[in-house]
Amino acid sequence: MIRSLYYKPGQPIRTNIPPAEFPRLIRDRKGTLWVDFIGEPEELAEPILRGFGFHPLAIDDALQETHTPKVDDWGDYIYLVLSILNYKQENGMFEAEIDELDVFLGHNYVVTFHDQLLTAVEDTWIACQRDIRHVQDGADHLLYRIVDSLVMSYMPLVEQIDAQIDQIEDQVFDKPRRDILEQIFALKRLLLTMRRILLPQREVLNKLARDDFRVIDPRDRVFFRDIYDHLVRLHDLNESLRDLVSGALDTYLSVTNNRMNEIMKVLTIITTFFMPITFITGFFGMNFFEPVAHLVGWTSQQVFAGMMSVMIGLPILMYFWMRGRTWL
């Protein structure tokens, strides 16, 4: 799908402009044109992109996903690759995938190219149609609004991750289950994916805020510097969350190890209690009552009662002895 939006001072916003008019509109420096490609096939998108005068290498990069945020300066326009983290939560676990947003920024136009509908782009598109202030400040300011919407979309995710970590920490102490461990590893994968996006994307915004691009008004660099500050903060939050997840994993392993040690302790105590009983029955056998009765002059019943008293009394004595040694 190809959709377009054009604003010129003193005129209402136009939408769904035929691609044949794009070359004429970009020659008019007073207006601002935004063309958005959503999953458009290469054979249809490439001729339109060539109509803007883009270099074939830049067009190839836009049509082929690279997943590496970058910015290329081509003089009259710049080409950006931005990564977007799409995520969903099922059964308490996050699943994420990386989408790519390719952007061409000229003096009076913005061209965006992506394979599927992106929330950040869609929100900006709707906002531009509702309020001309989103497009009346020029193409570079429109790019700022798109990127700002993209970056701010990470904040709800960070809050959800933080809340889930708190929940996991409480559950770990109550009852460490197998599914909690799976949630911890899912969070580690998600935060690692975020980190792989934030680091190179931060460098892209740093270049937009500091380098001298002809298509970006020096007065608008401060806006990109603001986005850069947001990315720095997001990166710091990501590092803090990674530390919290690692701490939750260490706590889980510590609690499970302690519980395993308690189980082994109980089993060892039970085994120790039965060791003298096993020794007695193994040494004398189960048919020693008659010989012993004749030897000591007791009846078989008396010998049986005596041996039972010994076998019951020994574990009791061992129990109090272990308590005295603070082993229990």
List PLM regions with ranges.
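Hydrophobic alpha-helical transmembrane segments and their immediately adjacent juxtamembrane loops
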Residues: 229-328
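Peripheral, non-transmembrane regulatory/ligand-interaction domains of membrane transport proteins
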Residues: 1-226, 230-235, 240, 295-298, ...
